[in-house]
């Protein structure tokens, strides 16, 4: 998925609108987007909307933390909606395989699991989490990660100017962990949704680090994510040239002054895989 739109589960208007937008996936959020007193109503709203939805998009629910009594109520909702409608469940603040296994034992339906890396310990355990056969992807949570490590910022998910690039390190570590086990890796949202230049830069950085897509918190962020994470025609042509040249050789080959080896070949194949995903 290139773009993953996060939608508060308590807004009928936002839920209905999300079905008409261009994101590859929608996450209906029962966790941070909904205050405690509003979670009962949010579950009722979301259940009604999902059961009546005709959307062909990949639909997901982000549940509350497993230590919260709200999580069991979220599971009741998941059971009533069912796996025919839900594509995946988003698990927040997972920091150990034991915590992941707790969730798996409780889940009433068999759906894909996407794990959020939002704490220092979660980052350290990212490879073990990615290795789990039930996990489809890892997603970075910049705001909670900053809180976890005591990183100050002027706004959610945004370090101080003196540490402007600091979050690239944990994001890259998470991407490495995910890709080491053949799983997808997603960057978290850019919170300044009216700052198109900042969003474009953040998305380009995530792509350059190897992320497969990015979360969005506002409709105007979707096209940026889709455009940046969709390989250009020039990139596709170059990848096809690399593959063709390598297949005609018995090893490393010179392509227009550039030495092409096995690593270059794997990068080319991965780009074409991303192209195929974006066209589905």
Language model features: what each stretch is:
Residues 1-280:
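Expand to "…catalyze enediolate/carbanion chemistry for C-C bond making/breaking, isomerization
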């Amino acid at each position: 998925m290139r773009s993953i739109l996060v939608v508060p589960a308590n807004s009928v208007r936002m839920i209905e609108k999300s079905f008409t937008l261009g994101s590859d996936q929608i996450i209906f959020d029962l966790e941070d987007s909904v205050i405690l007193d509003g979670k009962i109503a949010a579950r009722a709203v979301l259940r009604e909307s999902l059961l009546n939805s005709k959307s062909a998009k990949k639909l997901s629910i982000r549940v509350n933390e497993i230590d919260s009594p709200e999580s069991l109520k979220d599971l009741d909702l998941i059971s009533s909606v069912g796996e025919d409608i839900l594509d995946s469940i988003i698990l927040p603040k997972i920091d150990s395989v034991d915590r992941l296994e707790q969730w798996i034992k409780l889940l009433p339906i068999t759906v894909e699991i996407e794990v959020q890396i939002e704490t220092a310990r979660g980052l350290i355990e990212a490879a073990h989490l990615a290795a789990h056969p039930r996990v489809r992807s890892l997603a970075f949570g910049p705001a909670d990660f900053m809180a976890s490590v005591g990183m100050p910022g002027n706004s959610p998910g945004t370090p101080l100017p003196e540490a402007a690039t600091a979050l690239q390190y944990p994001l890259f570590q998470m991407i490495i962990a995910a890709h080491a086990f053949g799983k997808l890796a997603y960057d978290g949202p850019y919170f300044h949704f009216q700052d198109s230049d900042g969003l474009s830069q953040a998305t380009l950085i995530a792509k350059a680090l190897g992320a497969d897509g990015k979360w969005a918190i506002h409709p105007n962020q979707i096209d940026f994510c889709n455009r940046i994470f969709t390989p250009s025609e020039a990139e596709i042509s170059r990848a096809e040239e690399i593959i063709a040249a390598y297949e005609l050789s018995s090893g490393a080959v010179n392509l227009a002054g550039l030495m092409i080896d096995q690593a270059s070949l794997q990068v080319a194949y991965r780009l074409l895989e991303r192209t195929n995903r974006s066209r589905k």
